[in-house]
Every structure is written in structure tokens, then in C-alpha cells.
Amino acid sequence: MSAPLKLKRQRSSEVRSQRKKSLVAELKPVASVLVDTPVSHLEGIYDYLVPQELSSAAVVGTKVLIEFGNTKTEGLILARKDLDASLPRLKPLLALSSPSGLIQPSTLKHIELVRNRFGGSFWNLLNQAIPSRVIREENVFLDKENVDEILPISEEIKSILGRADCLQLHTKEKLRWGLSLPLSVNPTWFISEIAKLRSHLGQVLLLVPDEKDLNSLRKVLHPIFGDNLVEYGSHLSKSLRYRNFLQIVDKCPQIILATRSGSFLPLRSNSTVIVFSDLDSSHYELHSPGWNTRDVTLLRSSDTSLIFVSASHSLEIERLMDVGWLERKRYKRSLNHNYGTSDGGQNYISQIKKAISKGNVLVSVAEKGYANLFLCSRCRNTASCECGGKLQISSEKMIPQCYLCLKIIVDWKCSFCGDNRPYVIAKGIDRTAEEIGRALNKTPILISSGSKQITELPSGNHVVLATAGSEPDGEYSGVILLDGERVFNRPSLRSEELARLLWFSLLCRADAEAEVFLSLPNNHPLVQSVLRNDSSYGSNLSLKERRLAKLPPYYRIAVIEGKNSEISKFAENLRGKSEYEITGPITLRGELSRLIVRSPLEQASNLVDLLDDVVKIQSIKARQVFKVRFDQFDI
């Protein structure tokens, strides 16, 4: 019996259906895809059909272009599976948007751990971990073979580290160290030697605060490792950054030099991550969800060695060393520094005169400018503008100007007593240079500050004045640390930590016979720390104070910003939970308020989940979502 006749449109529909089926991958035709969507409550895993022509390349860790709702967006393949008859009608993958398997499973696991700690969107973290695609770089990517080689150990590093620690660095696969830089030892040389010792055991990822540190290390390491050294960071062009990322993924170079954005880079087993100065603010990501290099590194796989190197460690690292999670390592050289302090009216000029005959002298000051704050010489009242702003003097011959409204006060007189003589109490770098110039009128003086930074010192002996972070590389026969009270007592949660880091970092540049002036009294804890050659001195007291005050590193802090009414309502709901400490709401501007929530370390994951859920509910209800940041550099 012949088959029943069918309408033409029925036959063509069946042909299209059969053709469609034949185009679907034969093996595991369904891909589980994590979809990149700006709507937080829709972020999730959805199933898509894998076309046959994409099947071999559409593996786990590949970015794909998909249709989601009425828009096209990116997705990430997390798994491949068989077709289930119970599944609804699925849409196909449209195209690949990355090389096949670009994102390794270890990287995905690492990102997920970071997301669990800081909350927010997985895709935000993924986009920060993986650079933007540049297709032409995939076409010109060169296939170079890297050759590992064992480098000799220098006698100088042996003498500093000691035989036992040097042997551990050279042979032990797994290390967790908190390492303090020794005074009068060049940090770039020291870190380079540590990297060389670890490089024959596995890859070494060096994470540094900024491009300046990266350039210094490159100058030392590139002549040794050549093409086996790869640089990575946001300072590179988009094309070069992507090219270097491909090389890191494909060729596994021995040494990777990177800034903060390299924190997620994939590494082989038994690799080493060296984090330099984790307390530096450049290690903190500003974009959501606001992670930092230290915590991202601590969340790496257990077969990775972690070495935190700093002139003075953050209290977070100090706590980990105190509980034994990190092993404390401190090294000392034989020094003959001549110390002077602010006790007894000691003057640093005499130490500059003594040091300048032997070499360059570094003078560290707190602020740029000339007279950033002045009083009346007679009655000691603050010089203020009519608008309430403080008056400043930008140079010796300039007239006072309001820092707030920029009004120039031509014939300034004290509004209290009528005197016209200013008394400067907050000197800037220019005023300090002027005073030193008067005392040493034949000595060349250089200023390195702001946009006018000196990277390399010219030949000859100079007095170099610099603000924090602007100091030229080099060794100094004198280090003069001014403005100690201002540096140590800034209105910041981390002011004491940062003052300690600044001073110990600069003392690493002093030669073994240097003249050193500390602008604080002899009994000050920071001065005692320097005199004992121990940057951790006093950290136990600081940690006890932080624990009692319910502050980091024993508490995690969430800063939440949103509309006044929403923040107030959320704060009231949260006050009923005894495990959280609430500060605020604090009115910011317009209709915005800020809430600060502190949680003990043991319960902080619950707070992360709670805030994630709140943001999702706000998104579902089409309300303005909260801006949430955990563990910011400062509050």
C-alpha cells in the first residue's frame, strides 16, 4: 500500500527538521552554558544545542556566542552532555568567541572560589581574569619552545638567606612563607634571586604593585630568561596583552611578571606565586566585586607555593604568620647605620651634610606643594577663606589661595588679630627643598613628585626630595624620613601600616653605612621597630587592638551603598541579627546612603550570600540594586 499523500509544506517542514537534526553534534550534543547577562538574577546555566561544525572545538572552557531572550550575548561552556528527551526545545550555539578551551578548569575553579569570597557576578570576575579577544593575535601567535634551565645560586643570596632556607627554596616543592625584606638590600635584586631559585621547580608568577616595579624586575630578569619571561598587565596594549596571555596559556613560561590583573593567570602544578608588597593600594581592584591580589593568591590550588615579600607586611599577613598558616621568615644584614631622631631637637641637616660627601641623600616628605596649611604668626589661628576653606601658598613668592574655591587673597591679614605674617605648619616638598637649599647652598637638589618623577639619578652626589612612590631607584648614603607625625596619624584605618611600609621600604635603599634620620621621638613604636630592625615589632599589639575593636583582619567589612530609603530599611532588618556589627546609614550625596557591616571571619560567608540574595531580589523587582564591596583598601 502506498504512503498517504502529504501537503508540500508538510514535506518541506520535515526536510528542514531532518536537516536540522543532521547538523546537531552526534556526540554529547548539548552544552551547559553560563550566560553573561547584565541582569543579576538571570545569571545561571542554560542548555544549548551544539552544531556539528562546532562540536570538536566547543569544549569546556570555550566562550561562545548565543541567543538569550531577544539579544545575542556571550556564554561559557561548563559541560557537554547527551540529549535528554525531557529537555525543552533548545537554541543552538551561534559561534565560538574564543579559542577552543581557552579557560582552563583550574582557572574556573579559582574564579568560583573568589566569587564565593567577594560575591557579585561570576562574569565580572571572568572578564577581569581573561583579556579581551584580538583575533589577529591568534593568527600570528608563534610556536616557540621554552627550555627550562637550572641557574647557579649566588653566594650573596646564600649569605643572606642562610644554607637551610636557601636549600628549601631550591628544592622544596611546597612553601608558604611571609618574607620580610632585609634592610640595605635592593628589593629588586632580592626578589629576582628568589624567583631564580624557584624557577627550576616550576613556573614563577611575580605579582607587583605597579609598572615601575615591573620595569625594575624586567631589567634584571629578562637578560637571564629571555623569551622564557612573559609580561602581563593592564599597562600593555590590548593586542600585546592578549598575545602574552595566549603565550602564558599555551607555552607555560618559566617567569611571569604581572601587576594585579595577573592574579588569575593559569599555572602548572608546583608553581610559585610571589606577591610583592601586598599592602600597596594598587593590589586592590576598584571594579565590582572589588577583590585584592593577596586574597586571590591565597585561594589558589594547594599545590602552589605562596611567598609574600614585603618591607613590612599587612596585618592580614601578620595574622596568618601568627597562626602558623604562613611561615615567618626574617633576614638581617650586618649594618652600621647612624640613627638620629626628633628627640632633643636634633636637626637632620647635619646628617645630610655628613652623608652627601659619600653619595646621594634621599629626603622623604609627606606632601607636594609649598605651604599647604599656615597659621597666623601672632595668634596661631588657622588662615581661612570666607567660604570656610583653608588657605595655601603654592610657592615662596605666591600669595595665599583658597584650596576650596580657589579665591586669591592679595593682601592677606589674620581675621582674628590683623597680623599679616604666615606661620607654616604643613610644609610641602617645595618649602622643604627651599630650607635645605639655604643650609646647603652649593649642593644640587632634585625634586621627584607627582607628574615630575625622576626614574634614574644623574651622576654626582645629590639631595633628592621625594613624596611616597616617587623615589628614584638607587642606593643612598643618607635617608631622611620627615613628616613622621603626619604620615603615621593620617585619618585612615591603615595609616600606621602604611607608615611602617613606607619607612622600611626606603630603608632598603640605604647603604650599610648610611645616615638615617627619623622624624619621630625615640620611644615611638615605629622608631623602636626601625632601631630593632624588625618591621613586625608591635604588630601583636596592633592585632590585639584590631580584635577588640572588631576590625580587619579578624572581621570582614562590607560597604553597601544605595538609596536612602532602601539602605535604612535594610539596616533595620539587619540590626536584629546579633552576628553583625552595623555602622550607619551615613548620608553621602543626594538620595544616596552608605552602610558599613562587619562580620567575624567565621560567619562572613553568610553575609556574602545574604547580600547576593538581596541584590538578586532587587533585580527581580526592577529596583536600583545596592553597590556592595567587601574588604576595601580603606573605609
Predicted regions and their residues:
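Hydrophobic/aromatic residues located in beta-strands of well-ordered beta-sheets
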Residues: 204, 306, 361, 515-516
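Cys/His-rich short segments
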Residues: 357-439
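Accessory, non-ATPase domains that flank or precede helicase/AAA+ motor cores in DNA-metabolism machines
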Residues: 1-334, 338-343, 354, 476, ...
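Short N-terminal or domain-adjacent regulatory/targeting segments
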Residues: 153-167, 181-192, 393-404, 529-550
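C-terminal helicase module of SF1/SF2 nucleic-acid helicases/translocases
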Residues: 60-63, 346-360, 435, 441-635
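Amphipathic alpha-helical segments in well-structured domains
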Residues: 290-294, 429, 496-500
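Short, hydrophobic beta-strand segments that form beta-sheet elements in well-ordered domains
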Residues: 206-207, 256-258, 306-309, 364, ...
